[in-house]
């Protein structure tokens, strides 16, 4: 296409021009705005001839070219640049991919990488078998090394002391036989009511477990008539609050919560009697002390914590659970909760190390807890179930119980290995 025909097409845009002949000798277009008579866009191309004439260097920063025209010369330069870049990239790739030191693999030989791949399956199996051994070396206190309240330097000595002294918090599993006017069913009604009172006052977990411990230790040593059984429970909670809580409920609130069945004076008199009977010994290891440690060893989340405490509080109501030590109750609660959530028997080497119990030792107690879990919503004593059916406690009571533990039979611990592999 000649220049005249090009000028004839471009002249149709914008204002009419005087004539084709007048534009025949003009220089090739550098800016299409020159054609329509509008002021040219600020661009480096428009200013370049001025810089060449003046011979001075431009002091201002270069303007961004936002409306550069696509002329034939400019398009050709872009095409040449792309071809050169492509040739350079191909050459670089050839240099990188070429390894002059590496010889081709002769026929009948196998590369070392291929041989290692064939043995990966066996290595993976060995690693799975050694998982439990590696877990026994896990340091569960390393994350709290900078926390002075965690007392990581003395935590093992503390729990050694708790295990040595947990017998002090235990009672005879048949102490109710010495009571003439009350029985184990009345005790269950009292504990279920105390759990509701504890929830109503929004007290700490430590307070509840210490309250139940005070009640059992006092009833073991003191014969109590039926009419004063609730008084013993209210006073035990008052003592536990004084030992554990920052803000203690006033005695008048306890009078109201018991429907004014007792006076303030009666509560204070019972407080003296309990303290003298127990010789002011309020510092005893409860299941709560061990529960926190075992949950940490199990690397628990919020769901496991709530379900473990739900199962443990169900055990507080049951008189038959007094035959177990506090540490075993806590370990069995965590074990049962893990089984309910994972749907298989799970008890790691780390949990065994810190609890001092194996899965076989926990199985008997765990089966009883599964039965309590299954029947928690039925009957008259449903205080724990209602408490853990709320959103505040994660609706833990609605979790399906680990019924397969009841079906495992006497060889349950041997079955555990097969269930772990299935999981």
UniProtKB/Swiss-Prot annotation:
Basic and acidic residues: bias regions: 49-60
Keyword Cell cycle in record: yes
Leader sequence segment: none
PROSITE patterns with a match to the protein in the record: CYCLINS (PS00292)
Tissues where the protein occurs: Expressed in the intercalary meristem and the elongation zone of internodes. Expressed in adventitious roots at all nodes under submergence conditions.
Gene that this sequence comes from: CYCB2-1
GO BP term (any one): cell division
Quaternary structure note: Interacts with CDKB2-1.
UniProt KW keywords: Cell cycle, Cell division, Cyclin, Mitosis
CDD domains referenced in this protein's UniProt entry, alphabetically: CYCLIN_AtCycB-like_rpt1, CYCLIN_AtCycB-like_rpt2
Protein's name in the database: Cyclin-B2-1
Upregulating conditions: By gibberellic acid (GA3), ethylene and submergence.
UniProt-listed InterPro entries: Cyclin (IPR039361), Cyclin-like_dom (IPR013763), Cyclin-like_sf (IPR036915), Cyclin_A/B-like (IPR046965), Cyclin_C-dom (IPR004367), Cyclin_N (IPR006671), Cyclins_cyclin-box (IPR048258)
